[in-house]
Amino acid sequence: MKKVVLAAGGTGGHIVPAALLCQVLADRGYRCVLYTDQYFLQYTARFPGIKGYVLLPLCKRSGGAVRLLKFCALLAYSCVLSYIKLRSLKPDLVIGFGAYASFPVLLSAWLMSVDAVLHEQNSVMGRVNRVFAGYARVIACGLPLRTVGNKLAHKVAHVGVPTDVKKAVKRPLAGDSINLVILGGSQGLCTFGKTFALAIAELPTNIRGRVFVTQQCGKGQLEVITELYARHGIKHKLSGFFTDMQNIIGEADLIISRAGATTIAEVMAAGRPAIYVPYERSSCSHQLYNAQLIESLGAGLCIEERTLDVSSARDALTNLLGDRNKLQEMSCNAAKHAMPDADAQFCAIVDGLLKG
């Protein structure tokens, strides 16, 4: 039985596609082990089939000099730990999905001369993937990469982002109610949530009265936004973290979200129209480039956070929710450009390397 190690961590954008591929490869007869970090514990209920995983003792890099020193020490320890474990396991292939949690595993693969495959979800390659791009046999990408050097171009394969979200049957604004979904990313980076909440409260009465809001909120915003919606009679469901993303996305008439590639893949797989608000501090502005790409495909609207205020949010919502044809056009474009067979395409790459 061929052994495959997958490595991802930090955010759901890295963890979810890695966990999905881990399950699919295991179903195809591979022995799979997922190397990740503490953030995976938020997703164990979603992936109950994954029993073989290793939690690397990593922490966030940001937070001052002391935190940086702690991060470096834990990263070094994780490198040693990964090397010892991989020497014992003797994997046939290592697949890195980005984030610092993948660094120790990919470094160990390089030291052991084990073949490696990278998956870059975003349109701009992340730091860890850039480090190992030269070593990797294949660079699988979720979105078309903006810049790829001539030395790497032959390695790139556009496979999409593995997702378990299926195409929704429901058409946007097909019923009387309007299901608005506001997501903040797996790290709860929904600083724009209150802005859109205030904008929803200012929508024309004929639209506001039909709205049901499902919204991911940080702890500091939950009480404030709950009170705001209650005061304006807006039906709502708020939470810091949702586990049933497939149903939430599938039932949405319009989604408002950050522009991480995994979220985009889920939204497009469901064929949902969306407003994307890129996280300003995303590395190399990758969320901005992601959102601009989707906007150019006619599958979503990109609003930069620096230009976002209550007025612009209200106008965008009013224009879209008042135009069923526009939402349906965006929905069709999202479904048209989705890659629902990403896991199968990725498996074909793995099969080619290990069975070919």
Swiss-Prot record:
Membrane topology: Peripheral membrane protein
Function: Cell wall formation. Catalyzes the transfer of a GlcNAc subunit on undecaprenyl-pyrophosphoryl-MurNAc-pentapeptide (lipid intermediate I) to form undecaprenyl-pyrophosphoryl-MurNAc-(pentapeptide)GlcNAc (lipid intermediate II).
UniProt main location, coarse: membrane
Keywords: Cell cycle, Cell division, Cell inner membrane, Cell membrane, Cell shape, Cell wall biogenesis/degradation, Glycosyltransferase, Membrane, Peptidoglycan synthesis, Transferase
Subcellular location: Cell inner membrane
UniProt-recorded name of the protein: UDP-N-acetylglucosamine--N-acetylmuramyl-(pentapeptide) pyrophosphoryl-undecaprenol N-acetylglucosamine transferase
Amino acids binding UDP-N-acetyl-alpha-D-glucosamine: 11-13, 122, 186, 287
Organism in which the protein naturally occurs: Anaplasma marginale (strain St. Maries)
GO molecular function annotations of the record: UDP-N-acetyl-D-glucosamine:N-acetylmuramoyl-L-alanyl-D-glutamyl-meso-2,6-diaminopimelyl-D-alanyl-D-alanine-diphosphoundecaprenol 4-beta-N-acetylglucosaminlytransferase activity; undecaprenyldiphospho-muramoylpentapeptide beta-N-acetylglucosaminyltransferase activity
Family: Belongs to the glycosyltransferase 28 family. MurG subfamily.
UniProt record, GO biological process: carbohydrate metabolic process; cell division; cell wall organization; lipid glycosylation; peptidoglycan biosynthetic process; regulation of cell shape
Assigned GO CC terms: plasma membrane
E.C. number(s) listed in UniProt: 2.4.1.227
Record field: catalytic activity: di-trans,octa-cis-undecaprenyl diphospho-N-acetyl-alpha-D-muramoyl-L-alanyl-D-glutamyl-meso-2,6-diaminopimeloyl-D-alanyl-D-alanine + UDP-N-acetyl-alpha-D-glucosamine = di-trans,octa-cis-undecaprenyl diphospho-[N-acetyl-alpha-D-glucosaminyl-(1->4)]-N-acetyl-alpha-D-muramoyl-L-alanyl-D-glutamyl-meso-2,6-diaminopimeloyl-D-alanyl-D-alanine + UDP + H(+)
UniProt keyword Phosphoprotein present: no
Pfam families: Glyco_tran_28_C (PF04101), Glyco_transf_28 (PF03033)
Signal sequence bounds: none
Annotated pathway: Cell wall biogenesis; peptidoglycan biosynthesis
